[in-house]
Each structure stands twice: as C-alpha cells, then as structure tokens.
A protein has these predicted regions:
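Nucleic-acid endonuclease domains
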Residues: 1-86, 93-192
Length: 192
C-alpha cells in the first residue's frame, strides 16, 4: 500500500483559501469579460467559488507535502502551472469525486508533472502524480476524446516526486530507446 498523505486545513488556512479563491474567481471573471464581452456562467456563483476553493486548498496541501513556503509568488500568473519545485513546473489537479481521476485537457499548456488531489469529507488527500509525457499518451484518451484520463492506481507516490525533481534532468522519464538521439547512445556503447 502506498503512502497518500491527507490534510485537514485549520481555520487560518481555510480563510486563506477562501480569500484566494474569491480573488482568483473575480480575476478570471473580469478577464473573460474583457476578452469576450460577456460573463461566462457554467455554474452558479457558489459552485464556481467551491471549485476555486478546492483548487487552492489542493495547491496548499501539495506545498505543505513538498515543504514549500506557503507563498504564491512562484505561481505562473497565466495559469499554466501552479507551483515550481526544484525547477520543475507542476500543475495541481483537484477533484471532489468519490473515485478520483487525473483529467488533463489535450489543449493544456506544457508543464513537467501533474499532481492529483482529492477533496472528500473535509480532507484533502494527495492521490499521486505523473509526468506530462506519461499523461499525454494516446492510450489515455479512452474515456473522452478531448482529455487524457488516468486512474489513481497508475499514478506514482508523492514521495517519488521529490526524488524525480531532485535527481533527474528534464526528460529523464523517457525510455532510452524513445529518445531522438537513441542511435548515438547505442553506437557509443557498442564501440566504446
């Protein structure tokens, strides 16, 4: 059984998440209004704020798990990734589903890794993580055509994220025979 840390936010963290979620919601609403000329409303105001609260809470829990400071100045302002850990761009995906899935749109901007967090019963549970290269594979489009979907069981343990980010250079998760320069590596091993 792999370790999946759980967090319950205290009062100060909850207030922080609510205010940050409200600020993000207002920013997104104003930006969309400026870009399109209309306010987008897929859900009620309360539902949209809850989605933002769960997202901010998930990011905060991942920061706590990785021993990162609880500040947001390393967050990408355009929404491409949620935090930077040892030079790696990480996007936190939070869900409230009883059975969590990592769902990434095919049009998502590039990051180095995705972390899945589930909010259920007042607790945030970090389900696992996976590299972008492993997420964006054709066999992961079996559920929806517009997104990549991965079950929680195929995600890596969050403790491995520390090792991956700390030791491996970008692209280290690529198998040697998938690299563009694989023929050079083989030649160098054969002929010394």
């Amino acid at each position: 059984m792999r370790w999946t840390p759980e967090y319950v936010l205290d009062g100060a963290d909850q207030v922080y998440c609510r205010t940050t979620a409200a600020a993000r919601h207002e920013y997104r609403k104003a930006r969309y209004l400026a870009d399109c000329g209309v306010a987008r409303q897929w859900k009620t105001e309360d539902e949209q704020l809850r989605v933002d609260f769960v997202g901010v809470g998930g990011e905060l829990c991942v920061r706590k798990c990785l021993d990162l400071p609880e500040r947001w100045d390393d967050r990408d302002t355009e929404g491409r990734h949620d935090l930077t850990y040892q030079g790696k761009r990480i996007d936190v995906k939070a869900t409230t589903n009883a059975v969590p899935w990592l769902i990434v749109r095919k049009t998502a901007l590039p990051v180095d890794a995705y972390v899945l967090v589930n909010y259920h019963g007042g607790r945030f549970r970090i389900c696992g993580w996976q590299t972008e290269r492993m997420v964006k594979r054709d066999e992961n489009t079996w559920k929806w055509e517009y997104a990549y979907t991965l079950k929680e069981q195929v995600l890596r343990c969050i403790t491995e994220l520390r090792e991956w980010a700390g030791k491996d250079p970008p692209g280290a998760d690529i198998r040697p025979w998938d690299r563009p320069d694989a023929h050079r590596e083989v030649r160098s091993h054969r002929f010394g």
